[in-house]
């Protein structure tokens, strides 16, 4: 099987289970694995008014532990990991799985797509906050080592982040092999320092009893509700377990969770709780104060490495979601570079990378500390949790055929928990929660504007197109001069004559001896099997209609797709094949459709979209692009 036939995520499945578990530690668990850096510090932030008492500390640790057990272990590891879409996970895969189950109800199908698109848009907000809060919280450990380094925390954070984003264009294939071993050292360190500190206040193990979590909520009332907005930070990154399922498979992710990550996180949170019971003043930075003074600089270095790895996973996820959104028709084409010759899933999108870096630096410099950023973190995460739980209902009911009542009960249980966390984080909108919401809302608005604009453009082109059948019949009545070679006309409308063909005939008065009308369609599925990639329909006068199908995670390569026509008797010689593309120049006009300013935004996106020839891997010296003005 060639590289183009192999789905990018499935090549890892041939590796031994132990290596897959190690790789999963380095990719999947970076985000949730670095949460202990800031969760306890945020919960007991003086601004929240929660006192560092024994009952509160044990109650909070109990709340954190059971939140991890219910949200991560039960919802994601046990339930949602079963919802694989051709082996793939993530919100786009869950969206396509849920929406494909209600295709007979177009209105509901469209609503689900909008909900899923908003969830994907919020992921961009997460892509900003995660690198900012993770790296900043790690570097803040220098303040614990010596207060004299406090003025250097922000500059060091900025330098680390700039270096991280500059690395993206080179790819992480070389150093990526170190991610797993580094995270193993990280999780072992988490568990070890936690265990050592538990010995100083063993009564903290009472937190395993969920009654302490309930008692904390009842006795503290409003303060407990506010604390939920910080407790939820302990499960940020939990969605990565599902998002990265296509790379590693469900079994290695489950084994890595129960065999390494969950015990390490549990011991570390218990250790922080024990430290606070023994020394309430340690709330200034309970994570780094777990370490002996001689190990602080090493701990800061290790934490920085772990947060860089966590950030790398999120950045790669943003690139992946961007490409999926492009192929599902939610975003304009962008320049996509491949950073690995062996794994086609490793991509780099320059525009997204530098835009993301700019906004991340704004977040770091604007919020100034991990405590301030924590207020901005939870809103996008809890909104995504609510969306994924909602989509899961449709999988339970219509894909797995659960009884309606059982589907409602399961969904209601998780929605009640997600909604409690969501409500608590909404309280922080004014303190910074607005930041990821604004990012997500702007991206969502761009997505629906592009999707609506493309539909308007396609509808207009269909309405003015000459029917293909009539055109072919006219070739018999008035045959043009035919020249040697093959012409391939890309068209979104398989029933109409492409504008590029009409322009070519009008100006050159010739037609190639073989003409192909090629339409690319993207399915609501991650991968399309290679045997289903193409369909060929012979037309009259040596003309053919070819449809190429891709999934939203497939790599588009039209010359390779045309090679698949050889068993059907169609051979495309590269030096005798020319590709003709139409490039629409959109002219906004008042009237029906979108508001004029949205049409202008759409026109600007069309102008700045990357070249279709480059996107579809067409040979540059065999492409002719013809423009056409279109009013919408």
UniProtKB/Swiss-Prot annotation:
Domain of life assignment: Bacteria
GO CC aspect terms: plasma membrane
Reactions performed catalytically: K(+)(in) + H(+)(in) = K(+)(out) + H(+)(out)
Recorded GO MF terms: potassium ion transmembrane transporter activity; symporter activity
Bilayer topology: Multi-pass membrane protein
Coiled-coil regions listed in the entry: none
Localization per record: Cell inner membrane
Alphabetized UniProt keyword annotations: Cell inner membrane, Cell membrane, Ion transport, Membrane, Potassium, Potassium transport, Symport, Transmembrane, Transmembrane helix, Transport
Transmembrane segments: 19-39, 57-77, 111-131, 147-167, 175-195, 213-233, 257-277, 286-306, 347-367, 376-396, 404-424, 429-449
InterPro entries: K+_transporter (IPR003855), K_trans_C (IPR053952), K_trans_N (IPR053951), Kup (IPR023051)
Claim: Ion transport is one of the keywords in the record: yes
Keyword Membrane: yes
HAMAP family (UniProt xref): Kup
Function according to Swiss-Prot or TrEMBL: Transport of potassium into the cell. Likely operates as a K(+):H(+) symporter.
UniProt family annotation: Belongs to the HAK/KUP transporter (TC 2.A.72) family.
PANTHER family: LOW AFFINITY POTASSIUM TRANSPORT SYSTEM PROTEIN KUP, OSMOTIC STRESS POTASSIUM TRANSPORTER
Protein name: Probable potassium transport system protein Kup
Biological source species: Nitrosospira multiformis (strain ATCC 25196 / NCIMB 11849 / C 71)
Record lineage: Bacteria, Pseudomonadati, Pseudomonadota, Betaproteobacteria, Nitrosomonadales
């Amino acid at each position: 099987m060639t590289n183009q036939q192999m789905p990018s995520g499935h090549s890892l499945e041939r590796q031994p289970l132990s290596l897959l578990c190690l790789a999963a530690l380095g990719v999947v668990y970076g985000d949730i694995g670095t949460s202990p850096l800031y969760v306890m510090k945020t919960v007991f932030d003086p601004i929240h008014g929660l006192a560092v008492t024994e009952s509160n500390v044990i109650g909070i640790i109990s709340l954190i532990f059971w939140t991890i057990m219910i949200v991560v272990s039960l919802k994601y590891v046990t339930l949602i990991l079963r919802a694989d879409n051709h082996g793939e996970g993530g919100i786009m895969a869950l969206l396509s799985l849920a929406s494909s189950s209600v295709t007979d109800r177009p209105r509901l199908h469209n609503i689900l797509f909008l909900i899923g698109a908003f969830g994907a848009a919020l992921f961009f907000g997460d892509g900003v906050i995660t690198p900012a809060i993770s790296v900043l919280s790690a570097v803040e450990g220098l303040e614990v080592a010596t207060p004299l380094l406090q003025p250097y925390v922000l500059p060091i954070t900025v330098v680390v982040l700039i270096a991280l984003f500059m690395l993206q264009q080179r790819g992480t294939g070389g150093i990526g092999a170190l991610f797993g071993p580094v995270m193993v050292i990280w999780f072992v360190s988490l568990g070890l320092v936690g265990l050592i500190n538990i010995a100083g206040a063993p009564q903290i193990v009472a937190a395993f009893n969920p009654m302490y979590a309930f008692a904390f909520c009842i006795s503290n009332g409003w303060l407990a509700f506010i604390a939920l907005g910080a407790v939820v930070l302990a499960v940020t990154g939990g969605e990565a377990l599902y998002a990265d399922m296509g790379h590693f498979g469900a079994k290695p992710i489950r084994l890595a969770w129960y065999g390494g990550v969950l015990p390490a996180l549990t011991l570390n949170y218990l250790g922080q709780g024990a430290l606070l019971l023994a020394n309430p003043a340690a709330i200034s930075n309970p994570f780094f104060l777990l370490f002996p003074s001689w190990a602080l600089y090493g701990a800061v270095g290790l934490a920085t490495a772990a947060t860089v790895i966590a950030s790398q996973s999120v950045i790669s996820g943003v690139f992946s979601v961007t490409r999926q959104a492009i192929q599902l028709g939610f975003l304009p084409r962008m320049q996509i570079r491949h950073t690995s010759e062996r794994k086609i899933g490793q991509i780099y999108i320059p525009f997204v990378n530098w835009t993301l870096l700019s906004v991340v630096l704004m977040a770091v410099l604007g919020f100034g500390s991990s405590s301030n950023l924590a207020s901005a973190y939870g809103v996008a995460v809890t909104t995504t949790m609510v969306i994924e739980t909602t989509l899961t209902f449709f999988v339970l009911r219509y894909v797995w055929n659960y009884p309606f009542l059982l589907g409602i009960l399961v969904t209601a249980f998780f929605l009640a928990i997600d909604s409690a966390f969501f409500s608590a984080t909404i309280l922080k909108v004014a303190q910074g929660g607005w930041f990821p919401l604004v990012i997500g809302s702007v991206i969502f608005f761009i997505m629906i504007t592009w999707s609506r604009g493309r539909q308007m453009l396609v509808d207009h082109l269909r309405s003015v197109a000459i029917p293909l059948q009539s055109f072919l019949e006219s070739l018999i009545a008035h045959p043009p001069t035919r020249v040697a070679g093959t012409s391939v006309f890309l068209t979104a409308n398989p029933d109409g004559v492409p504008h590029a063909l009409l322009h070519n005939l009008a100006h050159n008065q010739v037609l190639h001896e073989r003409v192909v009308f090629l339409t690319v369609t993207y399915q609501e599925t991650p991968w399309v099997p290679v045997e289903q990639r193409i369909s060929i329909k012979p037309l009259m006068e040596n003309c053919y209609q070819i449809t190429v199908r891709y999934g939203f995670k497939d790599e588009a390569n039209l010359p390779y797709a045309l090679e698949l026509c050889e068993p059907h008797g169609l051979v495309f010689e590269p030096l005798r094949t020319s590709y003709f593309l139409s490039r629409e120049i959109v002219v906004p006009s008042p009237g029906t459709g979108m508001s004029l300013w949205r049409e202008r935004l759409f026109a600007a996106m069309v102008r700045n979209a990357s070249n279709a020839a480059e996107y579809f891997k067409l040979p540059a010296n065999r492409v002719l692009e013809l423009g056409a003005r279109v009013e919408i």
